[in-house]
Amino acid sequence: MTTKTLPTLSMQQKNLLLEATRTIAPHWPLDKLIAVNPLWSLVDKPFDDISDELSALAGIKTYMSNETYRAWFDEGKISHHCLTKAAEHYGLNEQDALLEHLSQANNLPDSWRNIADLADQQRPANKMSWHDEITHQVSQFCAAHYQQQSPTLRQQNIDNELDLYSHWLEVTNEDKGLSIVMGEAKLTKFFHNLPTDKDALFALVIEELALDDQSLSFFAKALLLDINGWSSYLAYLNWSKGENNDNLAKDDHVESLLAIKMAWELVVWRYLKHTAPALLSTINTKWMAQKQAIPNLIQAHKDALITSKVWALALEYSEQKSLNQTLTTEPAHNTTQTRPELQAIFCIDVRSEVFRRALEQQSATIQTLGFAGFFGLPIEYKAKDSHYVRPQLPGLLQAAITVTESDSDKGHVHHQQKEARWYRWGHAAPAAFSMVESMGWWYAFKMFKQTLFSKRQEHPANRLAPNTHWQLTQQGVLLTDQDKAHLAKGILDTIKLTTYAPIVMLVGHGSHTSNNLHAAGLECGACGGQSGEVNVRVLASLLNDHKVRTLLNDMGMEIPSDTQFVPALHNTTTDQLTCFDQTKDAKPIDRKIKDWFEKAQFLAQQERAAKLDTALLDASDKQRSKAFSKRANDWSQVNPEWGLANNHSFIIAPRQKTRHLDLEGRSFLHDYDPQNDPDFAILERILTAPMLVTHWINMQYNLSVTDNFKFGCGNKVLHNAVGGNIGVFEGNGGDLRIGLSMQSLNDGQKWMHTPVRLAVYVTAPKSAIEKIAAKHDIVKHLIDNDWLYLFQWEDNKVARFYQQEWHAEK
């Protein structure tokens, strides 16, 4: 008797599978939620090509429907000139019939079908869909496996931590319910014959499904995109392990998920081969034909999408033309050379633009600046006497310094810890009903009280004690005064203040909402999805420190002795600005400055009311402000603010060039003056860090609009938290949902975000921009592969840098 030799996985096949897992971009958990370009791992290829492939792979949409674009054209949002220009770009020159041609619905061909999908085409209507049950089973298993509060699945050997695939196989082999749900009596036994080793499984699938290199790559990508939510979260786990220098050999999470999906495909194939050979023969015919036609499939989708691409480009051209005219037709604001009364440094966030403009209207002696919201501090925050630690910097970076309150009184710490325990209990997935049940009438009263008399809810770690001093450590060692001075100098060198006002406000931002699982997504993305309060408090503490000031002076950085750095927080939901006293002996904020802030708040609220609630436009300032606060605290409110919706540009220039302009809260604003940057090192940092963050934000909003099913999270009302902070389900099943909810994008009547790729405007010499793009592949990819637009804005002229050439905008 001869034993059949099992197939082995070649290095080429292993690399193709690895490459497929690396195409998935990470998605951060709810408590650290930041915006991410869901296609970040693919920016080394042209955007149009990726759009064609994603459409062919999984029916993913990166453009709006032609009907939507045509409606925007009829509204005047897309100009005929820009439409013609976009059509010429794609080789469509039939001017007379152009509009009629572009207005036709783009009938897309079918997308790739996995084995389960092909089986469903022949499945009786009274039976559970293979695809739906696979998604449900895998998704529910992942939720249980990665449950953060407490494990909900047992393992046979608790001392031997299983990887995702091995644990799934162990649990599934004991799951008799699958056969019942699917109405397939013998289904479960087909899992018993699956190999426990992932590579052995991959080799079996490749052999039995007759996959060559091209179809293997396509198949693997399609399977991961089919459960893109969990793929993205597991990519985050891989990323976080890699950033912490942990070895992925223990468990590459995305690879394990791919193994589970392939295992299901193999089980369906083998099961039908055993129980319905005629049906499998039909499926095999389609499968073989599909594999051989992959290039044709992509080409068919490319051809079908051409009209959508023209419309999308025309929309971008139209938006850019309007902004170009705004930037070049008005003279720059002439700022006074005298010392300002007040300087306020804000985050570059688009929501800051509205408030900055309102604040500047109060006096010509006010100067505002834009800077990355983490204020250059590479920190993580550790709550005092607690194990709770969270990053306070962009997701792309790793914290080098830990900050902790050094003088919080014991009463405050005890209260904070008690609130944290209550918060964890109330937010744990299994606790929702047991909490109400065990607390009985008292909790019912609390819920009733919150409904009638709502108040601000926040994580206990955000309730910092007043007048806090900070302890800064690096790898457990306290920073010396010299270390602090060097840290402060590096930040001030980047901000490049040429003069210092008596009051310099360091304004972080945060969003205060109630009953909002995605609250972190409205916080400061540059602070890792947290409020910027810790960052501004720590930096103000450093810059007000007498010893640090003395050392800075010795380094040649003279700060006037009467200059006080004041930490503040801009509440983006209510547009209230709160100042924090850094020390007990700090000078009180002048009444005039407080009045400026209040008037700016009223102006900003009036502007935002037009989009949030038009009924508030006729209200008094006080009534409107009260309504904004009520809206923020209302736990039934699904749309407390519009966040960064409708962002479309990033302007890197001196503020005096835009101070006179109404940019409608759509532009990220980063102060930059090339005259203060002789070696262009600051510009290089901006183009390789903040620009990437703004691109991530822009693409998350764009793709959440164009395909909310794959890249958005659907209806917020139906959300249920998964495993603590992992993410959300829409309802009680399906894939993990990522991205933005419909309530963050659409007011029920129209889209509040226009999906256009980011336009970046830089005031700097062309040669400097060219050198930075040539030096950094990621910058070059974003520009030349059409993931964003890069313009030079100089002397009231705009020129686009693309494919290593400059093109004047007309």
UniProtKB/Swiss-Prot annotation:
Residues the record lists as binding Zn(2+): C347, D349, H509, C524
Source species, domain of life: Bacteria
Entry GO CC: plasma membrane
Signal peptide: none
Cofactor(s) needed: Zn(2+)
Keywords of this entry: Cell inner membrane, Cell membrane, Membrane, Metal-binding, Transport, Zinc
Localization annotation: Cell inner membrane
Family: Belongs to the inorganic carbon transporter (TC 9.A.2) DabA family.
Its biological purpose: Part of an energy-coupled inorganic carbon pump.
HAMAP family per record: DabA
Subunit structure, as described in the record: Forms a complex with DabB.
Protein's name according to its UniProt entry: Probable inorganic carbon transporter subunit DabA
Native organism: Marinomonas sp. (strain MWYL1)
Gene of this entry: dabA
